């Protein structure tokens, strides 16, 4: 199972009281439900491709409204041939939609009904239902961090975004071709959302992966930085050695001033060491890294003049 499927499976096992069951059910039916007319009677069909979500819808309807629910299974014929699970409610359909704030005065509304989110627990339950109905989250082991909740209706998607941001999740809203999404991109905010809706096992797994990824990224950055510094050091040392060999060939190292002669010989003998270490090897007394760099730069300048045929002052 995918990370998102495991998470939804966990969410469907959360025990809720009747009030919070209504809030969760309101999101599930608003986002995955459809109303039809059969034998001059309204029928609600709530559809999902997730078996555990279908069982959740079934149990919540029985818990809150105690009506008969048919559970149908159909085979999807296009693309992925997944099963489609349909919870069908024939009795009291209009009353149920009214009670869940989906139907008002005979008109369907896309906004979240305030009675469904009037306290903290109900807001969490509504967001849990919204995620079960239209949510997805990337596997943190293989992808960039991303969690989203899809809704057919822009007004409803904006409401979900606002609901998320009531918990300072920095959620964004985006219109898609066939609907809208509320989404999170920050790992920390995704963790907060998982905790918010009760996905604690998913949260632990997400945080474990996140810690390992962050550590790996930190190590990679450190290694890259160290490698770059090492390459820079080696390149500079090679240039120093090349310059010193040229000076030795053309005028001889023994003809250099004392302060340049010793550093030149040390660089030839100890090509692998840092400038700081070279400075500590000076027989005339330890000199700083900048002091060593200054003397080696003088040798490079001297070699450049030899290459161009310019006169040198010793």
From Swiss-Prot:
Keywords: Cell cycle, Cell division, DNA-binding. GO terms for biological process: cell division; regulation of sporulation. InterPro entries: Homing_endonucl, Sporu_reg_WhiA_N_dom, Sporulation_regulator_WhiA, Sporulation_regulator_WhiA_C, WhiA_LAGLIDADG_dom. Residues 274-308 bind DNA. GO terms for molecular function: DNA binding. The keyword Transmembrane does not apply. NCBIfam families: DNA_bind_WhiA. This is Probable cell division protein WhiA. It comes from Staphylococcus saprophyticus subsp. saprophyticus (strain ATCC 15305 / DSM 20229 / NCIMB 8711 / NCTC 7292 / S-41). The gene is whiA.
């Amino acid at each position: 199972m995918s990370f998102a499927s495991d998470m939804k499976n966990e969410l469907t096992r959360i025990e809720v009281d009747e009030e919070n069951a209504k809030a969760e059910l309101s999101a599930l039916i608003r986002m995955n439900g459809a109303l039809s007319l059969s034998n001059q009677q309204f029928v609600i069909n709530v559809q999902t491709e997730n078996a555990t979500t279908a069982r959740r819808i079934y149990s919540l309807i029985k818990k809150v409204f105690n009506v008969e629910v048919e559970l149908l299974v159909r085979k999807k014929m296009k693309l992925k041939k997944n099963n489609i699970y349909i919870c069908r409610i024939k009795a009291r359909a209009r009353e149920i939609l009214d009670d869940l704030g989906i139907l008002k005065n005979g008109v369907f509304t896309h906004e979240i009904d305030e009675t469904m989110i009037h306290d903290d627990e109900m807001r969490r339950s509504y967001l849990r239902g919204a995620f079960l109905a239209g949510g997805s989250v990337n596997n943190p082991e293989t992808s960039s961090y991303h969690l989203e909740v899809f809704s057919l209706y822009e007004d409803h998607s904006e409401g979900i975004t606002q609901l998320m941001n009531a918990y300072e999740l920095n959620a964004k809203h985006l219109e898609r071709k066939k609907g809208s999404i509320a989404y999170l991109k920050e790992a920390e905010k995704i963790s907060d959302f998982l905790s918010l809706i009760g996905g604690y096992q998913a949260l632990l797994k997400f945080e474990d992966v996140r810690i390992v990824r962050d550590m790996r990224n930190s190590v990679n950055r450190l290694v890259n930085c160290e490698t770059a510094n090492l390459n820079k050091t080696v390149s500079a040392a090679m240039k120093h050695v090349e310059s010193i060999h040229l000076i030795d060939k053309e005028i001889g190292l023994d003809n250099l001033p004392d302060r340049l002669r010793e550093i030149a010989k040390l660089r030839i003998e100890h090509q692998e060491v840092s400038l700081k270490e070279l400075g500590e090897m000076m027989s005339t007394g330890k000199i700083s890294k900048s002091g060593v760099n200054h003397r080696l730069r003088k040798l490079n300048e001297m070699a450049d003049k030899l290459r161009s045929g310019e006169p040198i002052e010793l």
